């Protein structure tokens, strides 16, 4: 792990740790406090209510906001890591698809491990609804998840205050873009469909993740 990724270097004055402790170490704490108490469960759904307030909060640069963005990123990385862990271990993949999945699996688990050194947030529980049981369905789902990850990181990069946190986030962003390109190719799609990517807000990303139904608690 590079020096960039140590908590001591990114959080020399303790601001991230202080803000993280204030937010809490569970996914429920994160969404409830970031959304100013708007955390009601979506019926049968993946995430909590009050998400527009959470998204609005991420447009104001501060060290506390950097912590919220890191926790948002960690939630997405938990999802991706769990998805690839299930797919690789499930036995439905083969050939170059399995090879790609193993590479991405290692990356996503490293992202989780690294982000967990920066902020405290427990992993959600997941139900991937058989998307890992069939190779074609897995490829299509992986493409969507990776495209979503790219949009999520690019959408939050302008909202990050601390240069070291920004550097950490953008170094993950470029890897997520490589993942997306690979699964686009495997899915028969254009590996680079445009000269410029359109970022997405946190609100839009959370809505997209909720729509999958993958996060169950």
What does each model-identified segment do?
Residues 2-26, 35-36, 46-217:
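All-alpha RGS (Regulator of G-protein Signaling) helical domain and cognate RGS-like helical scaffolds
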Residues 41-45:
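Hydrophobic alpha-helical transmembrane segments in multi-pass membrane proteins
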Residues 32:
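Phosphate-coordinating loops and pocket residues in cytosolic domains that bind phosphorylated ligands
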């Amino acid at each position: 792990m590079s020096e960039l990724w140590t908590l001591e270097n990114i959080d020399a004055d303790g601001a991230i740790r202080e803000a993280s402790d204030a937010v809490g170490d569970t996914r429920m704490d994160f969404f409830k406090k970031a959304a100013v108490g708007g955390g009601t469960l979506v019926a049968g759904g993946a995430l909590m209510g009050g998400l527009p307030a959470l998204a609005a909060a991420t447009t104001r640069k501060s060290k506390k906001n950097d912590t919220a963005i890191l926790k948002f990123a960690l939630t997405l990385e938990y999802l991706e890591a769990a998805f690839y862990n299930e797919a690789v271990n499930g036995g439905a993949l083969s050939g170059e698809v399995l090879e790609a999945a193993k590479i991405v699996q290692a990356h996503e688990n490293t992202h989780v491990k690294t982000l967990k050194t920066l902020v405290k947030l427990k992993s959600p529980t997941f139900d991937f609804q058989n998307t890992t049981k069939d190779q074609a369905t897995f490829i299509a789902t992986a493409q969507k998840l990776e495209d979503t990850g790219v949009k999520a990181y690019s959408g939050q990069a302008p909202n990050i205050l601390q240069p070291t946190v920004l550097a950490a986030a953008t170094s993950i962003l470029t890897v997520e873009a490589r993942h997306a390109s690979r699964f686009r190719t495997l899915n028969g799609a254009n590996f680079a469909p445009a000269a410029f990517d359109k970022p997405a807000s946190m609100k839009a990303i959370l809505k997209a993740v909720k729509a999958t139904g993958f996060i169950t608690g």
